[in-house]
């Protein structure tokens, strides 16, 4: 940042830009790592949102890996690229306007939105603060729309890969689903119990958390995110994913998926045990989830879909190659 300011608006040379961009990427990578620590352990983020402010977001991988033949062609490539600052992207998302940035920047911005949701849910005024909740929901919806205009990347995707586009966007989607869910359902008590590996505490906290998973129109949208999370594994093959994902998937997926599977299990349990009959939308979602699993899974775990989801997800995490 200081080097950029010292240039007084002049474009950097290729060598100068590489040095600056390397620093930015390292800084943002640490920011994402701290975001995952907050997700996992509910630690207060070590890097403040305000530290980025006027810092440019990471460039596209194409520009980062570009081997320019001369300074002139390099400057042309830099001028043609869309690089905005963290603050510009943040403000644009909260205004409901789509923002164009790189795949790496996409991952950075969903990390920022996740942390804003985390702070909001820890605020004493969270229950009454419907304005902030509306703004966060708008920003998340705009972030998802912005994927359509993300900086194009030339990336080779293996046929066996669970995603069709850039792997960073695949990882960002895991964080997005979790953030959408956390905005509606706060499972802090369950998360705390899971940290200490006491099965009785976990069972008690999940029983008490049932009422937090409402049967509402808004909850159906969250359950859709849960469906998309487990669908990735189901379409690839539950057992195959369980045995290979720890070595070739990013850690975001099991960490973010854990909350979603707890919410999904509690929602299914309520649907199966509540006296209130299921609505048409709830039944449609229930059947959509049921169709993801083969008959063998149902035979092993019984007819209750909540049991199937809980046991299958647990068996995936507790496979031969486990997540560290």
Where are these regions (language model features)?
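Acidic, Ser/Thr-rich, low-complexity intrinsically disordered regions in fungal proteins
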Residues: 1-92, 148-161, 195-198, 238, ...
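Long, amphipathic alpha-helical regulatory blocks in the mid-to-C-terminal portion
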Residues: 2, 78-94, 98-275, 281-300
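Intrinsically disordered, low-complexity regulatory regions with latent secondary structure
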Residues: 10-13, 78-80, 291-324
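Alpha-helical interaction segments
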Residues: 7, 54, 64, 133, ...
